[in-house]
Curated annotation (Swiss-Prot):
Protein known as: Cytochrome b
Native source species: Dasyprocta fuliginosa (Black agouti)
Biological classification of the source: Eukaryota, Metazoa, Chordata, Craniata, Vertebrata
Topology within the bilayer: Multi-pass membrane protein
Subcellular location: Mitochondrion inner membrane
Subunit structure, as described in the record: The cytochrome bc1 complex contains 11 subunits: 3 respiratory subunits (MT-CYB, CYC1 and UQCRFS1), 2 core proteins (UQCRC1 and UQCRC2) and 6 low-molecular weight proteins (UQCRH/QCR6, UQCRB/QCR7, UQCRQ/QCR8, UQCR10/QCR9, UQCR11/QCR10 and a cleavage product of UQCRFS1). This cytochrome bc1 complex then forms a dimer.
Binding residue positions for a ubiquinone: H201
C-alpha cells in the first residue's frame, strides 16, 4: 500500500497534498480554515446539484419551484437551507482565512495570495447570482441595483447593462443566464482552489512565528488530519444549529414575497456578507466613484504584498500593527452594520467615516506602523 501511495501517478498527487505533506509543527487552529472551506465548497456543490434538479430558471415559475422544493421534495427544505446558510458559512470562513493571512503575513506568498483574491471575486460573483435565482423581491431588486452599477462605466455602460440583462430589465433571460453562470462558476472555483494549493505547496505553509520552519516539519497525516476533523465537527455543529433552529436568521424577509417590478422594497440591501462593500459603495455620492470604491475595497488586498515594509513577517511580535488590524476588524463590523441601515442622517456620516478609515488604515497607517516597529527594533 505504501509503495502504491508513493508510486501511482494519481494517488501520488493526493499523497503529496494530504498525507506526506511536510507541515510546520507549530501551526495553530487558524490554519484549519483552508480545509474547512474545501469541505464547505463540496457541500455547496452537492446541495446545489440537488436543488438544480428541481429548480426552474423562469420568472413565472422560479419562486414557486423554490417553494415546491421546500414543501414537496424529500428533505428539500434541508437541502435548500443548507445551501443558503452554507453560503453564509463559506463567507465567514473566507473572511477568517483572509484575516489569518493578513495577521501572520501569509500574503508574502504572492502567487497563492493573488489566486486567493481571484477566488474571493469568483465566490462573490457566484453568491450574488445565486441570491437572484429564487426571484423573490430582494433577489429582483438586488439584481437590478447591482447590475445597474455597470451603467456608471462611461460610454458603454448602458449598453453593457442591457446586454447582461438580455433585455430592458431583469427578466427571464437574466434569470436563465444567471442560473447557467451560477452552475458553472463553482467548478471554475474548484480549478482555482487546485491552483491555490499548487502554489501553496511550492513554498510550504507559513506558521505563527513567521519564521522559516524547514528544520521542524511533521507529516500532515495523522497530526493535522485529526486536527482538521475537529474543525469539521465545529463547523458541522454550527451550520446544523443555524439550519435546524433558525434557518432564516441571516436572510431577508422581503425574499419571501415573489418579485414584483412595480413595488420597490423600502430598503434594498444584499446578503449580510456583502454589506461592508455595499456601505462603501453608498458612502460616495457619485455613481462611478462608488463603483470604483466598491472594487477598491476588495482589490486593495492585492497591495498587501507590496506594502509589507516590516522586517518581521508575522504580526505576532508587532503590537502596533496588531492594534491596527483589530481597528480594521471593528471598522468592517461597523461597515457591515451601516450597509444594512437606511440611507438617512446619522448612518450616512458613520458610513463615510468608516469607509475613509478602512482605506486610511490599510493604505497609510499599516505601512507607517511597520516602519515605526522597525525603528523600535533598532533601539
Amino acid at each position: 500500500m505504501t509503495h502504491l501511495r508513493k508510486s501511482h501517478p494519481l494517488i501520488k498527487i493526493i499523497n503529496h497534498s494530504f498525507i506526506d505533506l511536510p507541515t510546520p509543527s507549530n501551526i495553530s487552529a487558524w490554519w484549519n480554515f483552508g480545509s474547512l472551506l474545501g469541505i464547505c465548497l463540496m457541500m455547496q456543490i452537492l446541495t446545489g446539484l440537488f436543488l438544480a434538479m428541481h429548480y426552474t430558471a423562469d420568472t413565472t415559475t422560479a419562486f414557486s419551484s423554490v417553494t415546491h422544493i421546500c414543501r414537496d421534495v424529500n428533505y428539500g427544505w434541508l437541502i435548500r437551507y443548507l445551501h443558503a446558510n452554507g453560503a453564509s458559512m463559506f463567507f465567514i470562513l473566507i473572511y477568517l482565512h483572509i484575516g489569518r493571512g493578513i495577521y501572520y503575513g501569509s500574503y508574502t506568498f504572492s502567487e497563492t495570495w493573488n489566486i486567493g483574491i481571484l477566488l474571493l471575486l469568483a465566490v462573490m460573483a457566484t453568491a450574488f447570482m445565486g441570491y437572484v435565482l429564487p426571484x423573490g423581491q430582494m433577489s429582483f431588486w438586488g439584481a437590478t441595483v447591482i447590475t445597474n452599477l455597470l451603467s456608471a462605466i462611461p460610454y458603454i455602460g448602458t449598453t453593457l447593462v442591457e446586454w447582461i440583462w438580455g433585455g430592458f430589465s431583469v427578466d427571464k433571460a437574466t434569470l436563465t443566464r444567471f442560473f447557467a453562470f451560477h452552475f458553472i462558476l463553482p467548478f471554475i472555483i474548484v480549478a482555482l482552489v487546485m491552483t491555490h494549493l499548487l502554489f501553496l505547496h511550492e513554498t510550504g505553509s507559513n506558521n505563527p512565528s513567521g519564521l522559516n520552519s524547514d528544520s521542524d516539519k511533521i507529516p500532515f497525516h495523522p497530526y493535522y488530519t485529526i486536527k482538521d476533523i475537529m474543525g469539521f465537527m465545529f463547523m458541522g455543529f454550527t451550520i446544523l444549529l443555524l439550519v435546524l433552529f433558525s434557518p432564516d436568521l441571516l436572510g431577508d424577509p422581503d425574499n419571501y414575497s415573489p418579485a414584483n417590478p412595480l413595488n420597490t422594497p423600502p430598503h434594498i440591501k444584499p446578503e449580510w456578507y456583502f454589506l461592508f462593500a455595499y456601505a462603501i459603495l453608498r458612502s460616495i455620492p457619485n455613481k462611478l466613484g462608488g463603483v470604483v470604491a466598491l472594487l477598491a475595497s476588495i482589490l486593495v488586498l492585492a497591495l498587501f504584498p507590496t506594502m509589507h515594509l516590516s522586517k518581521q513577517r508575522s504580526m505576532t511580535f508587532r503590537p502596533i500593527s496588531q492594534c491596527l488590524l483589530w481597528v480594521l476588524t471593528a471598522n468592517l463590523a461597523i461597515l457591515t452594520w451601516i450597509g444594512g441601515q437606511p440611507v438617512e442622517h446619522p448612518y450616512i456620516l458613520i458610513g463615510q467615516v468608516a469607509s475613509m478609515t478602512y482605506f486610511l488604515t490599510i493604505l497609510i497607517l499599516m505601512p507607517l506602523s511597520s516602519m515605526a516597529e522597525n525603528k523600535i527594533l533598532k533601539w
